[in-house]
Amino acid sequence: IGISSAGIYVDNRTMLASLFLKVSKEDFDKKVKDIYIRAGKEIGDVPLLVANDGDVTALAGAMELGDTGILGIAMGTSEAAGYVDRGGNVTGWLNELAFCPIDANATAMVDEWSGDIGCGVKYFSQDGVIKLAPAAGIELDESLSPAEKLKVVQKLANDGDEHALDIYRTIGAYLAHTIPLYADCYDIKHLLLLG
């Protein structure tokens, strides 16, 4: 079984993952660290490999293109990133660009997990869409979950609503300004974007 998930995984064990932000340290150690190992055993005690979702994105891109130097970014609930170097290797680097600051404005949104301001997760994810909705003239029901709010904006965009489309254009502009920052750290030949 191949499992891709946000976070840091060592020997198929969850070492650090914002997915489990609200889980206490005690419960994390007891229930989360071996969550995927236990899931594999429940399915039938079959071989399993857990990898960072961003690395899987980049590897899929390398396989599809038959090339290397790929930075893969998936924008969804968060911002996942992975890299396949010019030698065709998944580097094992900590590619959590979700927590890379991209906005130095003192009033930038604070990421609740890292405590940093202006992190990519707040711009290249559902949080970014929700943040831009009021400026685009879209009111979202506060009782909705973040995923439900995103679906409202996505439906508007799919229906051709210019206000909703402007949100995605703005996120594209953010990304255009951020890619050169990423290129300072990664030798990018191809950029694979999902989300």
Specify the residue positions occupied by each region the protein language model found.
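Glycine-rich phosphate-binding loop and adjoining helix at the ATP-binding site
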Residues: 1-70, 102-105
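A mobile "lid/hinge" subdomain adjacent to the ATP/sugar-phosphate binding pocket shared
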Residues: 113-177, 184-190
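Glycine-rich beta-strand-to-loop/alpha-helix junction loops that act as flexible
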Residues: 2-7, 75-78, 189-195
